[in-house]
Each structure stands twice: as C-alpha cells, then as structure tokens.
Amino acid sequence: MSESAKAAAQNGQAEEQQLQQQLDEQQQLEEQQQLPPVTIRIPSPTCSRTVPKPKDSTEPLDRITLYPQPQETIQDIKLLINDWVGAYWLGPYSLQLPFVKGEDGRGKIYSKKKDFSEVRAGEKLNEWLEVQDAFEHLQEGEERVLEAVREPYGELSARQSIIRLLELIAPSGTTANTTSNPLGLQAGSTIFEQVRDGLVSANAETTYEEVEVSLPSGRKGKGGKKELVKVKRSVSGDKAHAFADWKGWAPASFGSLAVSSDPVEVAPSLKSIQISHFNPPPPHLRQKGHELYLQVSLLEGEVVTLICSTRGWYVSKSNVNNFDPSPRPSADGSIPAPTHSLIDLLHSISPLFSERVSRLPPISLDGALADPISTVAIPQATPAYPFLTSPPKPAISPEILRTQLAFLHTGAYGPDLVDAARDWNEEIQGIRELPRGTMQERVFREKMLQKVWAEFDQAAARAVQAVSKGDIPPINPAEDPKAHMYLQSNIFITQGDSDALDTYAHLGGDAAMRISHGKDAAGVKLLNKIDADGLYLLGHTIVDWQGRRWICQSILPGIFSNRRAVEEEKAQAETEAEAETADAVEGEQKKEDWVDVEKPTEKSGSETESDNPMMIYGLDSERPTSVHWDAATHSLLSTIATPLRLAAHTIKDGEGKEHEFYASAEVKGLKGQDGRRYLLDAQRLAPVDVEWLEKDITGPLVGPKKDDESAEEGVQYPHRLVMLRPELIEQFWESELKRWARGVAEKAQAKKAEAEAEAAAAADAEGEKKKEGEQSEIPQEEQSAAASAAAARRAEEDRPVDASLIGDIKQFNLSFNPDAFVEQPVLEAEGQEGKTEIKAAITDESDPSVKAVRDAGLFLRQIAIPAVVLDVLTGNTSGVMDGESLSKHLHQRGVNIRYLGHLASTIIQFSTSKDGAAKEPSGHLAALQSIVLQEMVFRAAKHILRELLYPLQPETATDAVSHFLNCLLGSCLNPAPVASYTPIGINSNEPEPAYVKLTPECLRAQIIKEVKSRFRWTLDESFLESGLRKKQLLRELASRVGFQLAQREYVFSKDQEEEENKREENIKSKEKKKGSKAGAKGETVKRTTTFEGEDVLTLVPVIKSTAPSVSVAEEILEAGRNTINRGKIEFGLDFMLEAIQLYESIHSVIHPEVASVYNSYAQAIHQIARLKIQQIAAQENPDPEQPLGVDISGALRFQRQAVAIAERTLGVYHHETAGYYFQLAMLENLEGNAQQSLRYFRHLLTLWDVIYGPGHPEISTILSNAGIVLQSMNDLSLSLSLQKQAYESTLACFGPNHIQTGQSLHQLVQGHFLAGDMASALETAKQALEIFKARLGEEHNQTKEEAKNVELLTAVIENQERQKEREEAVKKEATERLKMARERIGGGAASTSRPTGIRRLGGAGAGALPQGVRVVDPQTLAALAAAAGQGGNPSANAAAATAGQGEQANGESTGTPQIGERGTESLEELVRYIQGSAPGVGGSAKRGKNALRGKRRTGAKR
C-alpha cells in the first residue's frame, strides 16, 4: 500500500480520472478556441530617434502581430505591446476597432454585452473585455486589426507616464536604479550567473594569470617594452575545468565568499528627474488642462520644466526659480505643439538621452543586459537577504524622486487628499467569493488571492517597523503598554509575545501566548488551504523583528464598533420565522443569504453579559463558562471536520447545557457587520499532546545526566500549550487504516475454505520473506535492538494487503477530539475565593475519539521518531544539512521541535552495538546528531537573544547582537568581552540594559538551562566550547533571527588569529615590494573581539505568511507524478508541464514554489533518462546513439531557472539551493556538459562548507560524482585523486567495515582500473568484497558483482605475470645464445681493457674490414636484438633498427658482420651499447636518446 493509504483505493483513482477529464476538456476547448492572429497598428513618434532602426529592414515598426490565447483580455494585449521596441514610448492609449460609421453617426455597434456595454468601431474597448469577444462579428479567415489610439492625459496617466519612464531608464538590478527602498541590504541577490560562467572559484577569490603586454617605453622611434603584468582573468572552460586547482578540502573564507552579483553598470540617461516644486497647478491653469509639472536635468547640462496638459507634454519657459507656463519656441522661432509621449519628447530635446536609452531593453538590439530572472523585481515572494553583505558605497545615492514616489502612486499633495488605505479584508473576502466552478475560474481566483496575500505581507512588515519604532500611536493608550493595539495601513497590529490580559496564565503566560499565535497562524494557513466555502478568515501575518513578535491582521468589519448592533437584532427578529431552514445557508454565496441564520439562543449567558456581541460560536475566552453556538456556523465547520480528522463532541456551558462542536470550542466564530462568518483563534485545530503533558512538563530529562544532576530532573517546560502536528495526525490515520485493512483481510482469509489454506500460507511466507529482506537493508554492524525493532515495525506496516478482501473502506472510522485533555481554569468551591484549579474536562478514554488522541501521542514517540532515525540510518533521507532543513523535515514527518531531545536519545539508542554496549554514532547518524545538538543550541540562543533585544532601541540593538555573538562564538579569542553601550542621555535614570552584564560563562549556563527546559536534554558544557560548528551557527543565527553582518573574515580562536596575522603580513610585504601606498593609510587597529557593533549592519524582519500553496496546480502536479508511476510517462510529463504553467501564471515565476516545481520536473526527467539508459544497456546489441525520448535540454532550462529563483527567494546559501545545484550538476553531466557540471559540483562543495562544514557523508557523494565526470574528460589522475578523497571521507565517517565504505571502495576500483593500476584495483576490490560478504551475504547481487570484478582483475594480473615470465624466458634464452656465440668466437671478448674509440656496428669501406675484426653471424645479431627488444624497451627496438640501417649503408655486405677485437668487455656493456648508453662515448646518451626517438618511426616502417 502507498503512503497515501488505501483510503484512496476506491475514490482516489476516480478523482484523478476526473481531474484528467477536466484537463482534457479544457485542452479541447482551448484547441477549439485557438484564436487567429491580431494585428495592432501603432502610431508613429514625432522624433526619428525614438524608435531604433531594426537590423532586418523588412521588419515593420508601425504594427505588431500577436497570437492571443483564449481568455486573454485587452489589458493583457496592452502589456505585451508596452514591452515591444516599437511601442515602448507610447503615452496613454486605448485599443479600438477600425472606425466604421454607424447609423447614428458614431462607430458601428458590433455587439452588446450582458452588462449593457457595447463593442463599437472606433471607440475605446473595455480593458477587461476578452479579445475573442471583440471580434465576434468577424467571419473565420477575416483579418483582425486593432488600432492603438492616443488618449487625453489626466493627472493619473501623467503620473503613470513618469513611472513608466523610471522603469525604462532605471531597470531593476542596475546601478541606475536608486529609488528602491528594501527592508534589508542586497535583497534578492543571486550569484548563479557567476557560478555558471566560472567566475566563482572555491574561495570566491579572483583568479589571476600572467600575460605579456606591450607597454610604451616613452622613447621615440622604438617599440614598446614587453613586461609581465597580472591581469584579471576568469577561470573558464577554455583553459581548465573547475577542479584543475583542487588540492583537497579547504574551508571557505567569509571575507571573500560570493554572496551577490554586482548590479549591471548602466550609464544614466538623465542627470535627474523630479516632480517640480511648482506643483500642484493652480486652479486657473488646471482649468486650461494643466495636469503636472516635471523638472528634468538633461545630460547636456540643461534643466527644463516639462508641463503635462491634456494634449501631451511640452517644454515651458520656466526655470528653477521662475515659473512661466508658455511653451519654449523652437530653434526656428515657431511654437511646437505638445508631444503626446513624454519619452518621445525627451528623445527630441536630448540626443544623449536617445544614445543612452538605445542601450537599454527593450530598445537595445543587443539583448538584455543580464538574465531577467536575476534582475527583475520579485512580485509575490519575500526576497532573501544575504547573511553577509557590504554596505553600499556611497551609503546612499542622492535621489529627490525617492521622496516623491508616494505622490506618484497616490497623487496626494497633502493629508486631506490622501486616499483611504486599502481595505485588505474586503479585498481578500471579495476574491474568496469569486466563482471557482471551472479550471479557469479557479486559476484566476488563486492568482488574485496569492497576489493580495503577498502585498498584505509586505504592507504588514512596513507597518510593524513603523509601530516598533514608536511612530504610530496606539488606539488604546490608557492600557498596559504590553496590551497596546495599533492600526496602520488598515492593518490591525498587536503584540504576540505578551499575555497582558492573563488569557494564558494557566498555560504558561507570555511563553504560551507566543506559541499560541504561532499555532494560530499555522491553523489559518491550514484553513486557507482547505478553502471551505462560506468560512471566512482574516488576512493574517506574523512579523518577528528585533526580539518582538507582532500579529498583523485585516480588520474585522464592526470590531471597533462601541454601540449595540441594533440592525443585527432587527434582522434577527425578521429571520426568526425562517430558523428551521437555516441549514440550507451552507451552499449559498450571496452576502444577503448570510442573514438567514438560526437565532443563537443556546448560550449560557445572556447577550447583555457578552462583551463581544459579534461572537456567535465557541468558548468565550474572557468568560470561560460562556459558550456561544450557532447552527449555520456549526454546519459550515462540518466541512472541515473530514480533512482535519475532527470528531463531533459535546461541550457543557456554565449552565450544564451541551453543545456539539467539531473543532475545539476555543475556535471562535464571529459575525462581522458585512454579514460574513469569520473564524478566529485557530490554534486548536489539532489535538493535545497528552503524553508530553504527563511525562515531560516536569518529567525526567532524556539526555545523558551526570551523577549530581538528579535535582535537575524537575526543570519546568516553559508552557503547557503542547499540541500534535496535523502531519502526524495524517500519518497516524494512515497507519491505523493499514492496520485495520490487514485485520479485515486476515479475518476474510480465515473464513475461506480449507482448499485455499495453502495459498494463504504461501502468501504469508512471501510476506515474511519480504519482511526479512527489508530488515537486511540495515548493515549488520548497526543492528541495535532499537534499529531492529524499528525496521521490523516498518516491514510489518509495509506488508502488502489484498485489497479485494477489504470491502468498503468507509467502514473505517478514526477521528480525534480536539478538546480532549485540554486544560481550563475552573473556579474552586466556595470559601476559596480567588483560587482556580487547572484541569481537563474531557479525559474519558473509553470514548474512541479521546483514546485516539492518546494513541497519536504514543505513535509519535514509539513510531514516528524512530522512523525518522531509521530513514537516516538506511540512507533514505538526504538533504538534512542544517537546523532549518532538519526542522522542515521533522515537521513534514509530524515531529514537533520540542522532541529534539528525544530524537538525540533515539540516535544514541540506534548507535549501540548488538549486545547493547554504548557506541559513538557514526556516518549519517553522527551527522544527524551534530545537527540536532547544534539546533538545540541555536534555538536556546535565539530565545535568549530575543529577551535581550526586546526592550532595546534600534540603535542599541546592533551592539547587543555583537556582544551576544562574542559571548557565544568568540569566547575562545577573548574570554571576557566587554559590551559596548552608549546611553541615549535623555533620561538620567536610564537603566542599563541586560546585555551589558552578559558574560560567556553566564550565557553558557543559560543555554544549558534552556536546552534542559525546552528539549529535556542535558547539554555538556564542553560541546559549547569545542563542539559547535561556529561559522555555520553564525550563518543560521543571522539568517533565521534576522540580521545582516558585514562581510569579513571573523576570527573565532587564537590559532585562526595567528593564521590571519600571517596572511596579512604576507599581503603587506607584497605591497611594500610593489611600492604600494596602502601602508601610508596607517595601521589598522587590531581587534580584541571577534565581533564589533559595526559588524551588525541591520536587523531584518522575518515574515511568516499564512498564504497556502496553490491547490489547483498541486492537484495537476500530483496527478502527473501518479501517471508517471503507472508507466504513462508521456502523459505524466504533460501533466507536470501543465502544472508548471499554472504555477508560473499564479506566482509570476520568481517564487520558491515555482523553483520547487521546476526542480520536480527536472528530477523526473533525470530519473526517466537514467532508467532508459539502463534499459538500453541491458539490450543485446545496445546502440549508444539511441535517443532517450525525453527533453533533457528543457529540464536543464527549468533547473537553471530553479537555482536562480531559489537564490533570490530562499538564499544563496540555503539547503534547498544546494539541492537544486546538485540536480543541475547531474543533469549537465547527463547532457554531456562536463565543464558546467564540474563548476556546479565545485560550488556545491562550497555550499556544503558554509552550511554544514566538512565531514558530512553526503560530501563523499559529491566528490565521487565529480570524479566520474573527470573520467569522462580523461583526466584520470585527478579523477582517481577525488575518488580516493571520497573513500577517505567515507572511511572517516563510517569506519572500515561499513557498507558505505564498501560502496566507496567499489567506486575506487574503477578509478584504479582506468588509471592502469591493476594491482591497486585488485586489492581495493578484495577489500570491498570482504565487506559485502560480511554485511550483505554471498548471495547478494552486489557481492556477486564484486566477486566478478576480483575474478577479472585477477585474470588480468595473472595474464600480465605470464607475459612477463615469457619475456623473461626469451631474454634468458637470448642471453644463453649470446654466451654460446661468444665462446665460439674465442677469448677476444674476454679482454678487460676499456675501448678508447667509438663503437659501431657494421663495416667501414667497400667491404674492407679493419685488422683484428671478428665476424658475428646474423643469428647472433638477431638474438642480441631480441635480448634487448623483447623486454618491451622501445629504445632497444630502435637500436636494432639502427643496426640494420648501418648494414645497408655499407653497400655490399660480407654476409658475416664482425665486431672488433675490443668491441665489448661484457654482455651487459654490449646490451647497454645497443640501447644507446655505452660508457666512454662523449654525448652518446643524449645523442642516442634523440637518435632513437627519431629512428623509432623508421624502424617501425621497415
């Protein structure tokens, strides 16, 4: 059974088929409605320079042909026109059908719409009109033409023209863009293009190479002098690959780490532009059509004032000091007419403007300055802010228009003209009420919802900053400051970490309040995902900034009303007669219908007692005995009960009356004055973790304890608001469903006839076999009792079930009571006034829904947590690199972060030996343990830092952060750092903040205490001193707490300080040698601490949105995956591409969800391609050129975009970005782009170093894959080096006998084999074989494969040995024959005198022989050559060829070649002579070497 459970066995496939049918119908509809092209006629500009001449002279610039899609509107067409080079300059215009005179003298009427609008020829088309509706009157085949017609200006269109001009001359991501005002520095930066182009090396330092350049000597008549100079040159593929300088693992330097790309250099097109100070136009000039005055400083040095009238723009006679609205005459004295387009006018008055603008998109014919995905603004996602950055230089660029942007967008000159802020609530709820019956309606609705949620999040962050600084007064100034509420930009803002009203005093006070708001936001996000019709939720966002948590919500209509809602009472009286039909309100959508509700009479208290008359459902938190109930709201809540697995249960009010609820009674329903029903306080949509309440609030610690720590076991958990995660509820539900299905199947099998008993037994045996096979996945050396038990449970749960025996799946029923074990304050008996008792009202576990809550808590401890560790142990979990990735993984598995201590304890249990002896974790478990412990420290430190920052002013916060970091991370360098604090000085009694007194010892004690309290774990103090990965913890603190550090190398220890000092000394010495003036600037002051206040540049708000994922695209994406899993690959990929288009349409491309779906598609293509490669390789006669049939190039394009988007929205050094880079590197290698693949692998190693550091097992995988890529490039030496490093890393992580070590050795065998080192390959293969035999058994496929490798390598080496023996035998035989020949010749050769002349073979003269020369027969010479040549020495073979040539040179041969009497002293010398190394011959070795090299080819030819 799949993880989606057999619950989908009957209806899941039907739903998928229904979705597929819906998509097919939509596709058929689109094919039927494929629109013919539409030609847009564009007017001509007044200036000839406005539109550049195209490279292709046949391309017209007065018209553009577009191919609209169905449902595209006139507004969509205008957006396309605005980006075209021939129409970028247009001012306000409308699209019209060509004029045809009608009967009434106006344009001819072509059609009338239901909304009474008309489509007339020659009149402006409604921008929301669909394009196809504009041409309903045309027959098929007729030309479709629209005309862009200039429209008169208003103030709005004048301001829009200026904004359009700014977008043109100051594109996003360029140096010209100086008007942006982000929340942090270098928002949304990316380095992907640098990595792609090889501009980022391992340490991000610029690579230099020496080249010769000609420098002028200054002398007349003489050429320049060539001198070696250093020139910056990027490492690119035409010189060397990314690993060419790889020497091994080297930690990345923070000081030179690549964190962002420099903005594209763009020359300014105008000196300045600003709204003229003569604005607004006076009444008499406004009456003449004046709309706006604009002051522009041209590059030519002239400052002009442009006046916008209803007819267009013109240059006035005004100057900076005097206003004259008269048009400035032309050079010939004539008065020019206004120019309709502002951009066209600037072209006509400034040639330099035309020149500069022609280099910018969309006018430039050379393409974009940079990849748009790296530079365009991020519309619907929070940009990532790098944790390291450099302040801009200069700190701020002068830009007057930056202060006038508010006017450009609002048109308000004063507070009386400011438009009311956006009504966020009405926008959100209005979009919710849009129709969603068809796929197109759903897409449009979700697109609008995602857009408004993103804009709400950004507005909330801005509002929180204003509130936190004290710029916004509270709306309840008389109350406790912790209870202050604020209203800014129509956003209701409250503090989320103070329980000022003691609402959660019984659950933990402020700590419980903070958790409650986090759970509330999660509940709102979950309900937004469910999107139940008729249930409304406020816009909701959490913003954490400078130690405080702020809750931002849209305003509930009527929440600030102080009078009784007389209208509601009247409406209630009118609908009392219709109370019996109130249930029908469930499916209605009109607001008027929401009035038809039952009279909420079932309350414990009267309406006069209620402080909130809007509340109609749920438990009143201010009056615990008051319960509100409303039938219509209850009916609506039943729609969310099924997806959330909620059980119907009853709650008693103060009068003992019972009311039925689905969600917790603490989830409140309020009826706004707009008639809508809203849900608030959604924190209790999941049940309570009763196991934690009973065992871990004050229970014993699960971590290792010292002998003297028995008293510490009672450390109190900070709060009692502990709940299970919805993911765990779903997992437990699926697990119970499988167990129920197995029980039903077993009962059905038991009832079968005896004839089927044998078949049933065989099926059981097969199941047991699978169970044993799955258990064997764990290496035997790691089969601790805990691991074996977890594996057995996993195998039992995955045991297949015969679905035909189950019957109706609806018989299974499991739901949870969210009010079970919920603690509430209860007043005690009389006589004990003021005293309350905290107890739960629902605890009867005989109720299945209550017992299910208990069982779910046990499932979390006994099944879910061990399953997490088991998957890590067996290698089924990857990508857990840091605390953030760990938290995300645990949440997906339903494990709360408070269980980190239990998770660490489980790791220790899984690491014990088979006999139960304690053993240090290794491999993946060791890495997981390191991440878990560091995450405990991080979260404890975050809570402490938050408390320190809470009361501080912004200017003091940076000093507090730097001192905190010194105490946490810099104590090895300076054990007693002194805090920097400068009082504001306004109040003489100003108290000293708490951070000033913080010391490293105090901080370590607080962290240990926090870890004990929050995670039930005893943290060893030595871990804080030597176990922390400090650079990685610094990155996480900056990224997740929200602050940016100055980019520099931070020194954490004395040893590192010494290394930095040596490096600086080397730099200074080099500068002195070069005569650099750097030393004249003075010595830099030596730091005494790791961090200083100036290092903390800014604190960035952390936004937690409640916007859910896109459900309509998610459904199609999941359908695509399921289709691929069923073997229909082509249809599945089509589904995934359809989902990608929807994600792009809804999220506007640059969004983390779009990056995720890009990666999913590329990963699917990669897996399919690998599978097809295996299938081709398994064929009898495989064709390596056979196409795979998948679009790898398209997948590469998506994956590259995914990386860039992830860097901009998640972070350059984020765990998901690293995963995308790995997938990209693998795809590049699959496509054959080895150079690119190596660049990404090299950068991936840098990412791992920054995120985790060295020593993680997954780093070995990267090194191994890079080595395989190098093998394809024939760089076998470096490939072998990387394979060895991968093996050494694996050996260090897992030990010598681990299965992973065997796998690494198996990879290393191939490296040795390709390098030609057969002996090492054989030895490595034998080591791998021993590991596989011990861990997998001799019958395992991998063991058999390795045994074959050993057998083949042994055969190769034996063959080499036999060849060597044969060569030795031939050489020995030749030596014997030579000896016999010498004996036959006589004793002349026995002379011991050294020759004085030059030895040579052959005769001198025409057959005449010198005196005393003896003859050697040809057989002897051949034997001599064999003795030197059979050994495989190429020099000897060449010498034999030389001897043969010498004989031919003598002309006639005697037939008995002779050797002189003193020709040699011994056999060895003779052999050496033939090999060209005879002693006593001057320069013979050198000459022989060169001569043999040259005659080697001649001999080969002969």
From Swiss-Prot:
Main localization category = cytoplasm
Which stretches of sequence are listed as region Disordered? 1-62, 571-615, 755-799, 1054-1085, 1381-1403, 1429-1502
Clu domain segment(s)? 399-693
Q: Which UniProt keywords apply?
A: Cytoplasm
- Signal sequence residues: none
GO molecular function per UniProt: mRNA binding
Name the UniProt record assigns to this protein: Clustered mitochondria protein homolog
The organism is Cryptococcus neoformans var. neoformans serotype D (strain JEC21 / ATCC MYA-565)
